[in-house]
């Protein structure tokens, strides 16, 4: 796909901050140009829907727009600890108590298993893409290549939402554990403004301060951040081992007598929210551009960190519910309060310290990941190209880091955790589902190579997989006791996947590392992610729809025209270069003949 334009200007400006760093495209150079662009919106929109990027464009062309290269300093060791640091802390120390008490009881461990399996399926999809397309854009870049510009933009907006909201949730929980460490209630450190709505009236200045410190750590250099992360993560793992061992010594099996007080529905409802605990792994995929050997290091780092994470989550969930009846679990600081309840008041300080360490690394890795997402999104001119600039000295995207963490701090200052967690899960599941779809498209459809017959068969089977998965989720949400619907929807999903496996030939094989059991694992990832979406409350979907509506307005007014102009400018540059090269060849041949 032609998707360049403005490259020379960006290189010339380095890290400047001028008008052209924000709206350099032709459509925004005058009001007349802009009005003309708006009139052409339908045709431009169709162009962006039908246009797909190329692996080579993402790897070479897009990277050049940052002016400077990111430094390749990371190994599998760094990626593994980045994955562990990104994930462990957010789920265990933020949401486990909340979900065990309100939705699933002791069966919260099953919720972690369900969300963990779904996350592992997504990890496989991300890993293949990250190895094949090792750039900072993560899922945004993958969707640009396989599903086109428009779907990539919708994903990009939700990626931004995912990271900003996720960081805000963890920053607010950081305050809760800090208060516990000092023998205070979280509200002692928050400012209550009754004039604001109930969900936005508990202002959190400590969360803002934490975001500011993380910002400084994230911009100084990725290798330095990695050292800080794995030292902090190792300390955190020691605390986790203490919690598991010490917790089991205070276990009471009577607390497991009512294992599923909220039924199977509660297990899946919690699983949808607890998916928040696994989102850190996609931040690791954005570091592919800074990895020394992506083909080896990314699979080890991503898959390895997810295995460690899932085991830790399940063991700690079991420990918590054995220590204390689920009705008495504290939703804000569950482990600290649980140790106090069994007479180990001193242990809560170890737990609080470990939680603070864990949430600090979650924030740090999230800050690194979200800045790299934003950088690649800006390289595509879907956001101002000023955000794509990479600092020559540090090799990090300072502009994107500061902007994203400022937004995180603002939301953390106002918004309660429950709203953040529900909204985040919708966005995350939506993106992971589309990455699985993109993986199937990558394997089964190659432009110019796949026959029309095979393409049409693939689209039919993919549509049936999506439709049957959606129908299963809707039936689950609407029918609490019935089972007849599943006898229709599940076989359709199964037979559609079988048909894709045996009736549609794969058009492309991965060069280095690939997802096993295609199409089964991507198809299962699609089904599970959509099913978990069906377990989320209606209000969260309303907020998600509002945010998507805002994204569409921005896209129609700005993003569409910026990317269209950039694509056309780059196409002209390529054509001019090709003509020049052809002219040079002709001249050389003439000289030889002479």
From Swiss-Prot:
Glycans are attached at residues 102, 255. High-affinity permease involved in the transport of the cationic amino acids (e.g. arginine, lysine, histidine, citrulline, valine, and glutamate). Transport mostly basic amino acids, and, to a lower extent neutral and acidic amino acids. May function as a proton symporter. Keywords: Acetylation, Amino-acid transport, Glycoprotein, Membrane, Transmembrane, Transmembrane helix, Transport. Expressed in roots, stems, flowers, petioles, seeds, siliques, and leaves. Mostly present in major veins. Optimal transport of histidine at pH 4.5-5. This is Cationic amino acid transporter 1. Belongs to the amino acid-polyamine-organocation (APC) superfamily. Cationic amino acid transporter (CAT) (TC 2.A.3.3) family. One of its GO terms (biological process) is amino acid transport. Residues 2-78, 126-149, 223-227, 288-297, 370-393, 440-457, 505-511, 565-594 are cytoplasmic. Its main location: membrane. GO terms for cellular component: membrane; plasma membrane. InterPro entries: AA/rel_permease1 (IPR002293), CAT_C (IPR029485). It is found in: Membrane.
